[in-house]
Amino acid sequence: MSRSVLQPSQQKLAEKLTILNDRGVGMLTRLYNIKKACGDPKAKPSYLIDKNLESAVKFIVRKFPAVETRNNNQQLAQLQKEKSEILKNLALYYFTFVDVMEFKDHVCDLLNTIDVCQVFFDITVNFDLTKNYLDLTVTYTTLMILLSRIEERKAIIGLYNYAHEMTHGASDREYPRLGQMIVDYENPLKKMMEEFVPHSKSLSDALISLQMVYPRRNLSADQWRNAQLLSLISAPSTMLNPAQSDTMPCEYLSLDAMEKWIIFGFILCHGMLNTEATALNLWKLALQSSSCLSLFRDEVFHIHKAAEDLFVNIRGYNKRINDIRECKEAAVSHAGSMHRERRKFLRSALKELATVLSDQPGLLGPKALFVFMALSFARDEIIWLLRHADNMPKKSADDFIDKHIAELIFYMEELRAHVRKYGPVMQRYYVQYLSGFDAVVLNELVQNLSVCPEDESIIMSSFVNTMTSLSVKQVEDGEVFDFRGMRLDWFRLQAYTSVSKASLSLADHRELGKMMNTIIFHTKMVDSLVEMLVETSDLSIFCFYSRAFEKMFQQCLELPSQSRYSIAFPLLCTHFMSCTHELCPEERHHIGDRSLSLCNMFLDEMAKQARNLITDICTEQCTLSDQLLPKHCAKTISQAVNKKSKKQTGKKGEPEREKPGVESMRKNRLVVTNLDKLHTALSELCFSINYVPNMAVWEHTFTPREYLTSHLEIRFTKSIVGMTMYNQATQEIAKPSELLTSVRAYMTVLQSIENYVQIDITRVFNNVLLQQTQHLDSHGEPTITSLYTNWYLETLLRQVSNGHIAYFPAMKAFVNLPTENELTFNAEEYSDISEMRSLSELLGPYGMKFLSESLMWHISSQVAELKKLVVENVDVLTQMRTSFDKPDQMAALFKRLSSVDSVLKRMTIIGVILSFRSLAQEALRDVLSYHIPFLVSSIEDFKDHIPRETDMKVAMNVYELSSAAGLPCEIDPALVVALSSQKSENISPEEEYKIACLLMVFVAVSLPTLASNVMSQYSPAIEGHCNNIHCLAKAINQIAAALFTIHKGSIEDRLKEFLALASSSLLKIGQETDKTTTRNRESVYLLLDMIVQESPFLTMDLLESCFPYVLLRNAYHAVYKQSVTSSA
């Protein structure tokens, strides 16, 4: 070989190692995806499972790598038909295998060049060169093992080549070599052991240089603890001193990587195990630490079995085989417990480190090495556990189940967050370090070199100049630093000075190598913090252990003490994209989608768990609030009364019931109630949810708090509806006051959540409670507004119209009447003023408006029926309207009227509905006056000062505003809207107006018939009649006002007409002699007074002109006298 070939600068070892290592990872990624695709029936190339091609595939695999297209037409006939599709669809697979072959060629060339150059390797001196060399060896080995694991490789390559031959008349030019490689590497390690015989010297030198690094890293937890490893506070006096080491990059070098180097390296150059005691010690130590190694992602390599299978066929290796068996037994017995103790130590060490650095972030400067060591150590232990979890021995299964793994991952994430947050602090420190110390020391070292060739001198001078030119101002100005060129120059310099016969030999100037390694670490602290975090703490491997990942998460949530660390799992999803490679861009979407789905699932589960805890607390609080309801004090009052009256009972008295609040009396602080446990668990979980405001996963931003907010909204909605306890079958529903108590208790708990998590609980209340004021919520589910509206209309008011319930004006409530069939509910408990106020609180103005509109819809249907009755009697009523002063004619006409009772019944039903509405409106007014007194008083003032000459449309707008605030109006806007929607297309407005007028006539002339009804007796105690005819007053006034507003008539004139007709009709009762007909005459007379009292349009003077006041006075006297007699 010529001298020029041996010149290191022309060999470009540094560049080749860098490029080939990166390309090797890319090739591994592509092969891994091919293996996974072939293992998945859904993703497998269809030609491998096509029944028509089955015989062809078997033939190709059997003959592989030979190509026999002749005399096999029958077997390959189907292949001939699909050759173009096969070429198209299998090209990516085929050329990936070709790329692997080319990669192998390049690696072999480089390994040969390194051997020829007799490169010196020492991980503590030329770190980058040695690491990249060992990485390349392991990557190459892993690639060939992974290739041998693709069972369909022969079928894919063979199918493609046959299709190529059929299409182009010749095999693919790469096929012969590729086919031979596939055959040669059937047993890849055996083949590579032969292949690496020439490289044994270089490889063993590199591996043996680990003797100072690997044993120091592979210590037990007790040794770490005794050395107070990673502790910043063990020696307070040296806390500000920079963490230094002669082997800076080796301190955070992955233990996992070193074990792969040692295991695979000494398998390839196994001869050294027999000649070098150091090699044997390293090999045995690595074998005792693990049962399997991670080849790539979730592909593992069972080291003991593989090594034994390889050595068993080598003569004189019985001793090595015994070593392997002993190490296997040691790994099975002790490795699990050793790694468990390490994780236990690292949890406390990382916690201490994270706590100190969060308090004093300035220590990230001098102690940066500790941070990256801690991250690397923890990452190694987590990966070890992950790959062994599926391959654990049954004897010591507990050592491979770590329920506290979340805590370790959490502290890793905390340290990562500190590094990202305080990056500028570290930059300032290391910029000063590089310019003020490293540049000076390096300059002295260079000056003291006995020999320094020109090329090397130029490179090292550029190092000194680059560092000297640095200043803190660059950091303050936000300048972007880039030392990649400097680091590549040092890599090149390592290659130049590590070959044999180099003028400046790095082996003779170890101090220079160690100093430069330290400087390189310092430069990384300035410009490559993110890359350093990926190098030392990347856990993207979890992406390929989805089942184990989810299981760890579930264990974390199940253990209350660990739930505070559950945020670590969603945070890990941010790592996933770092495992992608540019040589395999097609997997980015797959991995990205997996990261999104897992992150979403974790955050959703955390929010659900928190929601469930909150729900349990709310349930407990609702129970406690329920105990304070007035109904529960009845028993206490009863006991007190009995005690006062000294009633002696034969039996012993019942044990005294515990009073509400007794649960708060603590006699012992060790006693932990269920509520305490729930609050503790909630605070732990909320810490996790509140840990980060948001996280970015594959160009998506996740906000953990929003998950909790949305879950709370959904659960609060369901809980409110659930607490109504509405049963459609039995028509049972919770009293509004009890529901309000429960809702307030629920809201109090939800408000306390703001103490744990920074969420806007007011927004939750607004969203949920506003939706509950509508007919349906955003999911189309019924709300408390629709449930209570239906119940009051279909249950309470229906029973009123059936005569089982009466409206008592004196009590402002509906009350059950004594009947044969007792009702399942007490009407008073749902309709008194306190219940109606509670209903108004719950439904709010919107909900009460919906209730009103529903009531008006029922009234409008009754009015429609009344109009039909008027139309049936239109001729008679027209005559009666003009003949009220002709008694005989009126009597004759009255007899011709039909459906008189139906008219009165329907008007009474309308009156009952309007009475209920007035209760609801009054309650709403009271509630709003309490919450918004100034606004209500302004609306009231506005309503009371509408000028009489105001346009009716304007007035109706004011009335609508007033009605929404619960204020009574002369004309009910809701009723006007309901009745105006009834206008018939076939009837002219004049005809509609006439029907409205005749309706009032019909009601007026029908009133006397009420006197004959037994139930029409007026009761002074309730200020009404038991058959609810006192509600007619409200019905007549409101219906008249609404109808004549719609038809633009004079309300006052029509009511005067009604009063004249009604008083004339009632006066005739006085002349009747039949006692049955007149039994409740006085009670019916009072209706006139009620109508006038209720009306804003009629006066007592007007009534006096139609109906003698003396009759009213006598009627009141008579009914009160009758009431006293009945009571007696």
From Swiss-Prot:
Give disulfide pairs as residue numbers. Answer: none
InterPro entries, A to Z:
Nck-associated_protein-1
Q: Does the keyword Chaperone apply?
A: no
Gene Ontology CC entries for this record: filamentous actin; lamellipodium; lamellipodium membrane; postsynapse; ruffle; SCAR complex
Q: Where is the composition biased (Basic and acidic residues)?
A: 651-665
What UniProt keywords apply to this chain's record, in alphabetical order? Acetylation, Cell membrane, Cell projection, Cytoplasm, Membrane, Transmembrane, Transmembrane helix
Annotated region Disordered: the residues are: 640-665
Single Gene Ontology BP term? Answer: paraxial mesoderm development
Show the GO MF annotations: small GTPase binding
User: Pfam families attached here?
Assistant: Nckap1 (PF09735)
Q: In which tissues is it expressed?
A: High expression in cerebral cortex, not in cerebellar cortex.
Q: Which PANTHER family would you find in this protein's record?
A: NCK-ASSOCIATED PROTEIN 1
- What task does this protein carry out? Part of the WAVE complex that regulates lamellipodia formation. The WAVE complex regulates actin filament reorganization via its interaction with the Arp2/3 complex. Actin remodeling activity is regulated by RAC1. As component of the WAVE1 complex, required for BDNF-NTRK2 endocytic trafficking and signaling from early endosomes.
Note the subunit structure. Answer: Associates preferentially with the first SH3 domain of NCK. Component of the WAVE1 complex composed of ABI2, CYFIP1 or CYFIP2, BRK1, NCKAP1 and WASF1/WAVE1. Within the complex, a heterodimer containing NCKAP1 and CYFIP1 interacts with a heterotrimer formed by WAVE1, ABI2 and BRK1. Component of the WAVE2 complex composed of ABI1, CYFIP1/SRA1, NCKAP1/NAP1 and WASF2/WAVE2. CYFIP2 binds to activated RAC1 which causes the complex to dissociate, releasing activated WASF1. The complex can also be activated by NCK1. Interacts with NYAP1, NYAP2 and MYO16. Interacts with TMEM132D.
In Swiss-Prot or TrEMBL terms, this protein is called Nck-associated protein 1
Protein's gene: Nckap1
